């Protein structure tokens, strides 16, 4: 008997979305954690300040959480062109799509023992 698994998947990111964040925000392109996060286009990401929305433990300071939706990835306004050139049409980790959250597992058994 053999169990076969792999890392969770990634998603092909095609569309940038501008996020406004302070310098101490996380560096991920598919999610952001930081103080006072704001989005240029709110329909492109899930944004919350409530840890319970994400089933996370309570933070000791005011923290915002942004999770990119669909095939979006976060860029900063002052580095928009650079990030578009570098990351458009690339496979990225870190969002809330099924591809990124589900870990595949298969059990292989011989036909007869």
Predicted stretch roles:
Residues 1-113:
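Feature captures the catalytic ectodomains and active-site-proximal regions of enzymes
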């Amino acid at each position: 008997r053999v169990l076969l698994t792999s890392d969770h998947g990634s998603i092909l990111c095609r569309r940038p979305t501008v996020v406004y964040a302070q310098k101490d925000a996380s560096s991920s392109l598919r999610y952001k954690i930081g103080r006072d996060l704001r989005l240029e286009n709110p329909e492109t990401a899930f944004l919350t300040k409530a840890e319970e929305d994400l089933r996370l433990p309570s933070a000791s300071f005011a923290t915002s959480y942004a999770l990119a939706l669909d095939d979006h990835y976060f860029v900063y306004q002052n580095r928009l062109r650079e990030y578009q050139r570098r990351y458009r049409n690339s496979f990225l980790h870190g969002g809330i799509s099924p591809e990124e959250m589900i870990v595949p597992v298969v059990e292989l058994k011989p036909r007869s023992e």
